Design a protein with these regions (language model features):
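A generic structural signal for well-ordered alpha-helical segments enriched in polar/charged residues
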Residues: 8-11, 116
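Outer-membrane beta-barrel transmembrane strands
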Residues: 1-8
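C-terminal cap/loop subdomain of S1 sulfatases and analogous C-terminal strand-loop tails that border
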Residues: 52-79, 93-103, 107-168
Length: 168
């Protein structure tokens, strides 16, 4: 399971004595699914959840509950469909413990964040000739203080649904 494999990874980092200097960022999939369907041979409740013999569907009611307080579900571009929690751990790099940040991040921010941690300026990241500038912003400032990662906009598009988020 995911918990066991993450545990193995953390144990190995600790054994290598690099855990405290390692930035770990973990995020979930976006939004709960409102699907109500049967796939393949259907759903066998006697089998372990997540196995090939199961297909658990929440349906719109429980999906709304799972995404609460946000609206809608996976596929939709409302916050319930696109919002994803991120947990960051870096014992020697993040002084805050157990605090919540409300900055809007995006997966395109991961590379600039890791380069920032490694001391590589964004301008020094090699790009293919003619490539557009590297998107994303470092999330490192948010590790110290909420409200420090600013962006003009983020655009979402998925299965015919689209949105432009400006500010908060």
């Amino acid at each position: 399971s995911t918990d066991q494999e993450i545990g193995r990874l953390l144990k190995q980092l600790d054994a290598m004595e690099v855990f405290d200097d390692t930035l770990i960022m973990f995020l979930s999939d976006n939004g709960a699914s409102a699907e109500m369907m049967i796939r393949g041979k259907g759903h066998d409740p006697s089998q372990p959840p997540g196995s090939e013999m199961t297909h658990l569907c929440l349906g719109p009611g429980w999906s709304s509950c799972s995404n609460s307080p946000f609206r809608r579900h996976k596929i939709w571009v409302h916050e319930g469909g696109v919002g994803t929690p991120l947990v960051a751990s870096w014992p020697n790099g993040i002084a805050a413990r157990g605090e919540v940040r409300h900055d809007m991040g995006h997966c395109i921010d991961f590379l600039p964040t890791f380069c920032d941690v490694a001391g590589i300026p964004k301008a020094d990241i090699p790009l293919t000739e003619g490539a557009p500038p590297l998107p994303g912003e470092s999330l490192v400032p948010s590790f110290a203080e909420d409200g420090t990662v600013k962006r003009d906009h983020v655009y979402f598009h998925h299965e015919g649904n689209r949105a432009l988020r400006v500010g908060d």
